[in-house]
Amino acid sequence: MKRTMLLIASMTLALLMVAGMALAQDGVRKVCDTNCNGTDGDDHLIGTANPNTIRGLKGADLIEGKARHDTLYGGAGGDAVYGGSGEDETYGGGGNDYVDGGYGEDYIATGSGNDTVAARDGFEDQIYCGDGYDRVYVNRIDVLHDCEKKLTNKPQP
């Protein structure tokens, strides 16, 4: 009986990974080949060289997009979202988030909370700050919308 259950569980996980959907467990580091959803806990979700769509959901998540065009959602909780290289879309969500678009022309939206945005990469980024007191570290070419504090020195994550 145990072997049958283990076989079924292994096959189910393999099918989910082949379909490009990976499930993260609380406190577990998870590599997401294409699309990935976190849990209600604190997740560490990592993209690959493929374009990724990663959703942290609840919890204080660490999300890394890596290469190419990634779409990253922090969700509820104080998240750290890193776009990596490529033209990324990064969304902080609710909570006090740290959002770094990475290298490339990025779209960054913080959501509610007192957020910190890092966009000093030499590319023109579009940055939309939400409710709360947001600090953004930018280049002169970045375009800001509703951001409370603009800084040009390097942020400390």
Task: Annotate each predicted stretch with a short phrase.
Residues A9-M17:
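Bacterial N-terminal signal peptides
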Residues A118-P157:
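Leucine-rich solenoid repeat scaffolds
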Residues M1-T4:
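Positively charged n-region of N-terminal signal peptides that target proteins for export
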